[in-house]
């Protein structure tokens, strides 16, 4: 029964954060949505920040599971990176909570939201880093600083998918994959 209440609270808080954002969500709202007393929330979470942390932690696990679900071991590393990043960015752009948090950070600059979004990005980079380390050990890509490579890979992908489209025709998946392959495997042309 206690586990059910905890789950109800987390689901209600996720809904509230998705609808109203972090700053506008109150524990009273969460209690109403979860159909529990406000005190019940505090038996599981000491404050709103701890509840938010739980939700973001679950979100990161969901994102990693999404990324893992598209990996095809028979494909080259660069194609799997492309598939993985496509899935992660799709998740981020379609998940209501992520949309609201990105919007809140942009419009209000809420510190707690900025920190959690940075945490999500750090987790994605850590995930990519593990995959890059495996690819290096298999000789699929040349050795290098895996943390920097992971960071650049994520930022380059976001730039090609989102930023490029502001002033240019959108790139096809094949074009994005080719650009990433050039930079990841062959490096910058002379």
Model-based region annotation:
Residues 1-20, 24-36, 49-53, 62:
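Basic, helix-initiating cap at the start of DNA-binding domains
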Residues 18, 42-46, 58:
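Base-recognition residues in the alpha-helical recognition helix of bacterial helix-turn-helix
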Residues 19-23, 74, 95, 138-139:
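Short coil/turn segments at alpha/beta junctions that flank glycine-rich nucleotide-binding fingerprints
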Residues 39:
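Key DNA-contact positions within bacterial/archaeal DNA-binding proteins
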Residues 54, 68-94, 149-153, 177:
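Hydrophobic alpha-helical connector segments
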Residues 61-64, 68, 112-138, 147-151, ...:
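Amphipathic alpha-helical packing segments from all-alpha helical-bundle domains
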Residues 83, 87-90, 126, 130-138, ...:
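C-terminal peripheral helix-coil segments that are non-catalytic and often amphipathic
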Residues 89-129:
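Short secondary-structure transition hinges
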